[in-house]
């Protein structure tokens, strides 16, 4: 499988502060790769280095088998799309007019604009001026712009952070479809549920360092344990870990016919993040 992104021993410092520490990973063609961590962990810094907006302090970063800084060259820009918190939209014109302007840069037909608007569920609102939009709608417009030219590689920095559940699910479905059509996706998020829904593989980033990397199911198997929820006849619920001393108590409840129901609970990706890093994902 072709490697789209290859990062080796990446370092990034801002004056006396080291934001990224010895980060290495690679992303294969067709993956949805989640870069997960709390605010301030280095996610946005990494995405800016990968797209050539920032220069690394050390290490090697290659995208499409070229130095990442080459993505800032006009010839490379048609190969990737990016969504960040900086919209760069023209606020005094409509959603549709913004996308039509960008479509001209890629020599695209007007139908590509219609398709992108439907992708983000904004076709009916296409005539609205950007300066009248909510934060969530602006985020959807910038996502439409990022996928307008059906890029080979899509960088998404917290893509659903300002969206309601309905539009979030709509975007999830669209991203899966885009991925099925061949787009590789690099996704940063602090939403572990989002990562579980979308990502083939994830990396846990904590204080600028990757603490674990792998498929969500593999990370759960490696670091997590299922628990049992025991519901008693008196209405109480008890959580019991596998191999814990509480198992003896559970068998006593069962022998005394005190148990109404027992269910198995799989750890969430958020639980695994806490297990690996020792901190909550905030």
Predicted regions: what they are:
Residues 100, 104, 110-126:
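Conserved ABC ATPase "signature" region
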Residues 59-69, 75-76:
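Conserved ABC transporter NBD signature motif
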């Amino acid at each position: 499988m072709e490697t789209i992104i290859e990062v080796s021993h990446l370092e990034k410092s801002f004056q006396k502060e080291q934001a990224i520490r010895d980060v290495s990973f690679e992303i294969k063609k067709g993956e949805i790769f989640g870069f997960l961590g709390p605010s301030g962990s280095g996610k946005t810094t990494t995405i800016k280095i990968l797209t050539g907006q920032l220069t690394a302090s050390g290490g090697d970063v290659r995208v499409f088998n070229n130095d990442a800084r080459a993505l800032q060259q006009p010839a490379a820009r048609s190969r990737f799309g990016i969504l960040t918190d900086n919209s760069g939209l023209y606020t005094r014109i409509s959603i549709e007019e913004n996308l039509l302007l960008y479509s001209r840069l890629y020599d695209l037909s007007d139908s590509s604009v219609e398709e992108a608007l439907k992708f983000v569920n904004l076709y009916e609102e296409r005539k609205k001026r950007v300066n009248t939009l909510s934060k969530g709608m602006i985020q959807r417009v910038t996502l439409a712009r990022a996928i307008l030219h059906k890029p080979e590689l899509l960088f998404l920095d917290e893509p659903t952070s300002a969206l309601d559940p309905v539009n979030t699910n709509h975007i999830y479905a669209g991203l899966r479809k885009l991925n099925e059509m061949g787009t590789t996706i690099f996704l940063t998020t602090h939403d572990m549920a989002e990562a579980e829904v979308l990502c083939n593989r994830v990396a846990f980033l904590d204080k600028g360092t990757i603490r674990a990397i792998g498929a969500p199911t593999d990370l759960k198997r490696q670091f997590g344990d299922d628990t049992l929820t025991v519901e008693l006849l008196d209405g109480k619920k008890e959580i019991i870990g596998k191999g814990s001393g509480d198992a003896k108590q559970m068998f006593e409840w069962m022998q005394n016919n005190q148990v109404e129901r027992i269910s198995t609970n799989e750890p969430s990706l958020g639980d695994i993040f806490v297990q690996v890093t020792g901190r909550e994902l905030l």
